[in-house]
Amino acid sequence: MPSRSISAPVPVLAPAPIVSSLVPAAPSGHQNKTTRIFPPFVVAGAGAGFSLFITLSVCFCKFSRKRSSPPAENASSSPRRPSPREFSYSSLRRATGSFSQANRLGQGGFGVVFRGTISGGENVAVKVMDSGSLQGEGEFQNELFFAAKLDSPHVVPVIGFSHDRKRRRLLLVYKLMDNGNLQDALLHRRCPELMDWNRRFLVAVNIADGIKHLHSLEPPVIHGDIKPSNVLLDSLFSAKIADFGLARLKAEQVEISVAPERDGDGSMVEEVESVVTTVTGYEDFNFGLVDQSPESVAKVPGSVSASPEATTVVSVSPEMGEKTDEDGGSVVVMKKGKESESKDWWWKQESNVERGRVKEYVMQWIGSEVKKERPSRSDWIEAAALSSSSSKKLEKKTSKRLDWWLSLEEEDENKKKKKRRMVREWWKDEYRRELAKKRKKKKKMTLEAEFCSDDGSSSVSQWRRGSGSGSSIDWWLDGLSGERWLRARGNSHDSVSGEIAKSCGISSTPSMRGTVCYAAPEYCNLDNNVSEKCDVYSYGVLLLVLISGRRPLEMTGSASEIQRANLMSWARKLARRGKLVDLVDQKLQNLDQEQAVLCIKVALLCLQRLPISRPSMKEVLGMLKGEVNLPELPSEFSPSPPLKTTRKQRR
């Protein structure tokens, strides 16, 4: 029994604590479950949101860069364009139909252009150049050099090239422009699309944008031959600049000054500041006119001091090259106003100051040579004592020498007479020329007086033309006077028919100095003073041609058209009268007069004589688009005040 009493409560008491222990265990187990599940979920959500934010920010940055990158690429897009590929001569021959005349597009300055279709169905223009001429080879190298550097929608791209050594042919392949060049479309075919003012104004803006792109490169590219025949039109009549045969990179001028050094005597030797012209990135091509003749190269000795104010050019002849001074160099630098002393008579012969004394040095030298050969009196006495026959021989020799001396004097006198006669004849010719010039000048003054009386306004360029010489290289700036045109009409009938006018607009360029009427005055000189302002001047002429629909020089044959023959001179006269609207092409449709007058004023600013006075192409483009305010025209283009009439003139 006691065992039963002890074992009986055990099953009764055991469940009670178990139940009590399990009741509070439920909430504790619930708390452990919440701490293990919710924190990882929150962390995962936060991480996902943060990663999503990062991806969105990266995508936004890439999208913004894509939108802002095209202008930067256009500014420096030279490496983007692929280099021209080489074609075989046979493939280009098949593409052009064996260069048939039916596919001929025109004649350029250095070759004939043919139309062709290469593999893939792409239409191209193939220019066949003559490799025998130096100008053709220069253009070929220029085109290939600039092909990979110029990448602009306003520049005609070069697709490829070909060089046939057997036939000595150089070929360039361009992208075909469907509407040809601006010269043909505007002045010959008279395309109806260009009769709309908006289309013509857009062509002017496209050309300005293309030139601005060339000038914005580093180093700047100078086209050198901007004219309508070098502007091509695509299917949408968008203008593109072509023909980089005369293009060049702008040269950088670096002044190198050397400190003065002391000579051995203690005197200061002045060094002349030299200007070194360098072209960056253009070492393989040399398009300047360099004189490499032996007469132009001379060695300057270290002992001769040259001052900056007194350097004169002396031509070095082969005879002079043989004689050198102690330092081993020929004397080739002289000072103005001071005669360089030398022991050699030939150096004095080259001096301009002592030309009249050349004969004296020659006579001294001849006399010294005769004295060397002439025997002395003692020799004559000894010879007479020895034998009489030898004395007779000596007398004969001396008589011959004296006769030779007299013959030289007679020749000198004859030369003097001939020279005097030539001088007299030269004086007569000069006098006749001066009389003829005076007569022409009087005729000009009468014509200008009649012109001023008709206009009622004075002309600045006419006054310059009357005071200046008529043989200036920039004669087209001042305009052709009526006397010149009348004289041309009397001499030839071709000038009346317009052959002279056509010569200024054809695409051929006979020289490496640009095209007449489009080249700037400083570009026509033989110095290397070439800058971007040369293209600005050419663009001014092209802008006047585009607005007026006339050539720079055009003569129809009527006497009333004489004053309008020179387009630049006529524009200046209209600016002084305040009638710029008269210059606009009368066949234009939808004309905006304010915009047309703006274009003419911009062209006049580009046609200023001094390069520093002309605006840059960036400013020109800003003026045309209205982004830059148009400056006032110079006083020579502004309308002149009315003439004051006195009482005596009224009576």
UniProtKB/Swiss-Prot annotation:
What is the catalytic activity of this protein?
L-seryl-[protein] + ATP = O-phospho-L-seryl-[protein] + ADP + H(+); L-threonyl-[protein] + ATP = O-phospho-L-threonyl-[protein] + ADP + H(+)
Q: What are the subcellular locations of this protein? A: Cell membrane
Q: Where along the chain is ATP bound?
A: L105, G106, Q107, G108, G109, F110, G111, V112, V113, K127
Q: Does the keyword Membrane apply?
A: yes
Gene3D superfamilies (UniProt xref):
Phosphorylase Kinase, domain 1 (3.30.200.20), Transferase(Phosphotransferase) domain 1 (1.10.510.10)
Renumbered to this chain, the Low complexity biased-composition regions fall at 69-87
**Residues spanning the signal sequence:** 1-25
User: Pfam family of this protein, just one?
Assistant: PK_Tyr_Ser-Thr
Which residue intervals are topologically Cytoplasmic?
62-651
Origin superkingdom: Eukaryota
- Give all residue intervals belonging to the Protein kinase domain: 99-633
Sugar attachment sites = N32
What broad class of enzyme is this?
transferase
Question: Extracellular face: residue ranges?
Answer: 26-40
**Gene Ontology molecular functions:** ATP binding; protein serine kinase activity; protein serine/threonine kinase activity
What the entry lists under SUPFAM superfamilies is as follows: Protein kinase-like (PK-like)
PROSITE patterns xref list: PROTEIN_KINASE_ATP, PROTEIN_KINASE_DOM, PROTEIN_KINASE_ST
The UniProt annotation puts the region (Disordered) at 66-87
EC numbers listed for it are 2.7.11.1
Q: Which UniProt keywords apply?
A: ATP-binding, Cell membrane, Glycoprotein, Kinase, Membrane, Nucleotide-binding, Receptor, Serine/threonine-protein kinase, Signal, Transferase, Transmembrane, Transmembrane helix
Q: How does it sit in the membrane?
A: Single-pass type I membrane protein
Q: Which GO terms describe its cellular component?
A: plasma membrane
PANTHER family named in the record: OS07G0586332 PROTEIN, PROTEIN KINASE DOMAIN-CONTAINING PROTEIN
- The protein depicted here goes by the name Receptor-like serine/threonine-protein kinase At4g25390
Taxonomic lineage is: Eukaryota, Viridiplantae, Streptophyta, Embryophyta, Tracheophyta
